[in-house]
Amino acid sequence: MATKAPNDLNKLFYGDNLDVLRNSIADESVDLVYLDPPFNSNRNYSLLFKEKSGDQSQAQLEAFDDTWTWSHESETAYVEILKSAAPNQVKDALEAMRKLLGDNDVLAYLVMMTQRLLELHRVLNATGALYLHCDPTASHYLKIVLDAIFGGDNFRNEIIWQRTGSKGYQTRRLPNNHDVILGYQKSPASKWQLDAAFLAYDLNNLDPKTAGKYSQRDPDGRRYSLTDLTGPNDPRPNLTYEVMGVTRRWRWSRERMDEAIAQSLVIQPKPGGVPRYKRYLDDQRGKPLGDVWTDIAPLNSQAAERLGYPTQKPLKLLERLIALTTEEGDVVLDPFCGCGTTVDAAQRLGRKWIGIDITTLSVDLTDARLRHTYGEQIRDTYEMLGIPRD
């Protein structure tokens, strides 16, 4: 268990994230964990790490080879969890899945993930949250593990991100065009930024319902709706008074009403009619964000931010998650940081960050990305730890 005190520098670690978490990340020192681990879906990206000489680091190869097999190392890790101080429900869940699945690649993947998720839970603040990005081949198993570690009551959302359009005709099933992001809070005190949970209206492309509700326009084109100003059955006498020749029980005090009238926000639709409030569309928070995200496009080969990294996610996706769950100055941790999208998003939003990856290629790519985006001076704001140098 790490007890080192954090400093003000961001950190980019080269190494096995399990070792880094255990030895270098203190308890309750992180506000948000986002992880996009290798999916157990038989995809192989290991060729990415071949050097021009043809040599490969075995650690790098195994780190990004998206196929997991049950081995002596898997058995050792499984026994370690059962003998550890992990909650009994975690041990029960793993034992049950071993009975269900047998000693196969799926179980090996789940054991590897359980070790790391236990450590990630430890390093999270009580006000923190974790979001795990996966695909449907493993999401149902991972949710069992997360429920056991965080508690089912701390499950927040299963976010569906549509990462591609239809992949064409499938003979015996529908094509898979989405990823899953499982969100958990550390406790009911975990942060949630409500203002970030709305999508700004596209005033040039409104859905029919919103366009119908805000159908009226000012001469300058601003859309608005007229809403009721009369109040509920509130007995307070100061809410009953005359406005524009009409006496009613109103929602607001006289002072607030006069202020709105002075701002031309209260109008009388017709002579003698009940005054109403002008609610402008562009003053509203926006459309509430749901748990199916279709508005963030995947990166295609022409995308300006694309780095050629096979599992690179859009910057906008990470910016949204960070904005929803953290405040400026909070610490964001990505234990599978890949090409550095999470740390880039955290940097843009004024958060501190920790990135970990087991491949030198990923760590060097993240370093280069940050320096290219923010200038060489950014290098003074973070440490690179564990990098082997000649």
Model-derived features: where do they sit?
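Core catalytic lobe of class I
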Residues: M1-D367, H372-E376
